[in-house]
Every structure is written in structure tokens, then in C-alpha cells.
Regions:
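HAD-like aspartate-dependent phosphatase fold
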Residues: 1-223
């Protein structure tokens, strides 16, 4: 399926699929509270189908689950939760040529769980071999604040790993920039970026790999 199909309700496609991928932010919650109708829909789907929550949160899924618990979104509403943070960790641990080298973290301290037990050393920009971007440091920051640091990163010709490709997010009534906006700005400056998360193919391949291992079934991607 190459083009999106706009539906009036899930009942139009419900019988065609065994597993539903459901985004979190903007679909299930707004960063502050859950949408009651979304919870009702998930509860009905889970009666006979499997639900996989997917998120561009630049943190491990267990960390995101703790946040979901705070807004009363419980495990009973889904089967699996997979984040762009999970994929980023998988890459840094298994695929990254910079393994065991030093990195500079461009992002808030709340995302530090992304790097736990990876065998990587967090360091200053001057000593870094590559950069991991997880977002803006303060929710109210504008992109202009990051021109200076991006120029320094570009001067050192460092590759950037973007752990959240989203450009913006709405937290309640507030709009915030995400790591994707910083990464796109770095690309415009001529920097190299590798993205992990929606809508990139690598993320969905990673999810299908996990599902195949967990449920011992081959995923029919053509459907």
C-alpha cells in the first residue's frame, strides 16, 4: 500500500489485519492526558487483535511506559511498545562503527536513559567522535538558539544521529521543536544525519523483526 487511505472508522479495515500499529503522541495522548475515545478504541481492538504502540520518543520503551503510567495509560491497552529510542540503542550497540567511542549529546537531560549500558562515553563536543541529538534542551527554545552549536559540529565534520525524526510536537496547547527540526537544520548546513524512527523504513523493519521473534510469524508487509 503506497498511498494513505483515509477512513471514517477502523471498522472499515478491522477484519483485514491481525496487528495494528498505533502512534502514541497525538493519537493516544497529547503529552498531558489521554484521549478517552482512543482508549475505548484500543480496548475494543485488543479483544481479538494485537496492538503495537510506536513512538518517536528518544528514550527506551520502559522509560516511556513509566510516563504512560503517570497519565493512566496502562499495559492492558496494548501488547507491545517500541520507540525510536529502542532502535537508536540497537544501532549504537550493534551496528554503529563508532562503538566504544565518545559522543556528544545534544538534548535534554531527561533523555539520558537512552545511553545506559551502551559502552559509549559521553563527552564534550571537542572530544566527541559523533553527535546524538534527542531534542531541544528547554521546551520553549527556538531553533535560532542552536545555530552556534551546529556550526561547531559542522566544522568538526561530525555525523549526527537523530533519535527523534519528528519536527514539532504539541504538548497540550504548546508547540515544541523536536530533534528532527535540529537535524534538518544541520543537513541544510551540509551536515550528515542518520534518522531513527517514523517515517523511516529502518524503523518498521526493526519492528517487524521484533514481532517475528516474539510471535513466530512472518509479517506480510504488502498488506
Amino acid at each position: 500500500m503506497n498511498n494513505p487511505v483515509f477512513l471514517s472508522g477502523l471498522n472499515k479495515i478491522y477484519s483485514r489485519f491481525d496487528i495494528f500499529f498505533v502512534d502514541l503522541w497525538g493519537v493516544v495522548h497529547n503529552g498531558v492526558e489521554c484521549y478517552s475515545n482512543a482508549l475505548k478504541a484500543l480496548k475494543n481492538i485488543k479483544k481479538s487483535k494485537k496492538i503495537v504502540l510506536i513512538s518517536n520518543a528518544p528514550r527506551p520503551s520502559n522509560n516511556v511506559q513509566r510516563f504512560l503510567n503517570k497519565i493512566n495509560f496502562r499495559k492492558k491497552f496494548y501488547n507491545l511498545l517500541i520507540t525510536s529510542g529502542d532502535l537508536t540503542r540497537f544501532y549504537l550497540q550493534n551496528k554503529n562503527k563508532n562503538k566504544n567511542k565518545s559522543f556528544y549529546h545534544l538534548g535534554p537531560n531527561r533523555d539520558k536513559s537512552l545511553f545506559i549500558n551502551l559502552g559509549l562515553k559521553k563527552t564534550s563536543l571537542n572530544k566527541a567522535n559523533f553527535v546524538v541529538c534527542t531534542g531541544i534542551n528547554n521546551n520553549k527554545d527556538s531553533l535560532n538558539k542552536y545555530f552556534s552549536i551546529l556550526k561547531k559540529i559542522k566544522k568538526k565534520k561530525l555525523k549526527m544521529i537523530c533519535a527523534n525524526p519528528d519536527l514539532i510536537v504539541h504538548r497540550g496547547n504548546q508547540t515544541e521543536y523536536c530533534a528532527g527540526s535540529i537535524a534538518k537544520l544541520y543537513e541544510k548546513m551540509g551536515g550528515k544525519v542518520k534518522y531513527f524512527g517514523k517515517p523511516y523504513k529502518y524503523f518498521y523493519e526493526y519492528i517487524c523483526k521484533i514481532l517475528k521473534e516474539k510471535y513466530k510469524k512472518k509479517i506480510n508487509k504488502k498488506k
